């Protein structure tokens, strides 16, 4: 695990520990059981054409603040109005300015499947995601031992959610497939130095194989990048910074899906 990723994971563990002290796992289990049924994240990404997972995050660790007017409910409605297929919500606090509360607000404001975007390493975070209304969550291969990845993926599905399993190279694709991942996200951003390689999805497409949803993550600057990824065989793109900086994110999404 890279130094940058290790630091983010350590902070996620610390944040989870603080929340665990305030709300027990037993209580979360009750809340998760009472949450509305999960919306089908994978099915939304399998719709004809290029699907868009529209992400909301107030900050970037490498670029700082992305907006000075962060309103998750309004963003969720704008994303849905623009034709997004799903919403991704950063809940990691340090570096991203996220909060679990943002997810609950976004989920209540739209009818799209909502993904919890965080550094998930603990079953508590999975229960918390479902209790907040999440329909899916992110699992990063580079942050987890293979057996741990498989266990967390199974726990995610037992809670009625799907996982976006993130990879960055051939070995990680193999680990994701062995764990049973159905939705695989190729992160074009190298978490060791935050550099971007937009050709990565094309190189890994054959490795992922058919029958699974493949998502291109990071570095989509506009419609040309989206079209290139679609031509490479990607089923969906996850777009964050472009939308956060857009004056009209709904119109920007229409340009990506059109």
UniProtKB/Swiss-Prot annotation:
Q: Which GO terms describe its molecular function?
A: indole-3-glycerol-phosphate synthase activity; phosphoribosylanthranilate isomerase activity
Instruction: Provide the family line.
Output: Belongs to the TrpC family.
Tell me the gene name.
Answer: trpC2
Pathways involved:
Amino-acid biosynthesis; L-tryptophan biosynthesis; L-tryptophan from chorismate: step 4/5
Protein name (database record): Indole-3-glycerol phosphate synthase 2
Q: Is Amino-acid biosynthesis among the key words of this record?
A: yes
Q: What is its EC number?
A: 4.1.1.48
Record flagged with keyword Amino-acid biosynthesis: yes
Highest taxon in the source lineage: Bacteria
């Amino acid at each position: 695990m890279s130094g940058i990723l290790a630091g983010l994971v350590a902070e996620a563990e610390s944040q989870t520990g603080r929340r665990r002290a305030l709300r027990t796992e037993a209580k979360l289990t009750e809340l998760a059981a009472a949450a509305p049924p999960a919306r089908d994240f994978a099915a939304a990404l399998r719709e004809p054409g290029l699907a868009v997972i529209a992400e909301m995050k107030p900050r970037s660790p490498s670029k700082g603040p992305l907006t000075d007017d962060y309103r998750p409910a309004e963003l969720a409605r704008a994303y849905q109005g623009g034709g997004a297929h799903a919403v991704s919500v950063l809940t990691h606090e340090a570096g991203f300015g996220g909060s679990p509360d943002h997810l609950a607000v976004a989920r209540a404001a739209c009818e799209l499947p909502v993904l919890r975007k965080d550094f998930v390493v603990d079953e508590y975070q999975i229960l918390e995601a479902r209790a907040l209304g999440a329909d899916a969550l992110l699992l990063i291969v580079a942050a987890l031992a293979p057996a741990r990845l498989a266990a967390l993926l199974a726990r995610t599905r037992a809670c009625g959610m799907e996982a976006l399993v993130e990879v960055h190279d051939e070995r990680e694709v193999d680990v994701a497939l062995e764990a049973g991942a159905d939705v695989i996200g190729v992160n074009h951003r190298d978490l060791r130095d935050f550099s971007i390689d937009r050709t990565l999805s094309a190189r890994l497409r054959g490795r992922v194989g058919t029958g699974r949803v493949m998502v291109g993550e990071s570095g989509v600057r506009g419609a040309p990048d989206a079209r290139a990824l679609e031509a490479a065989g990607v089923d969906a793109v996850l777009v964050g910074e472009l939308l956060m900086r857009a004056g009209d994110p709904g119109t920007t999404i229409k340009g990506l899906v059109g």
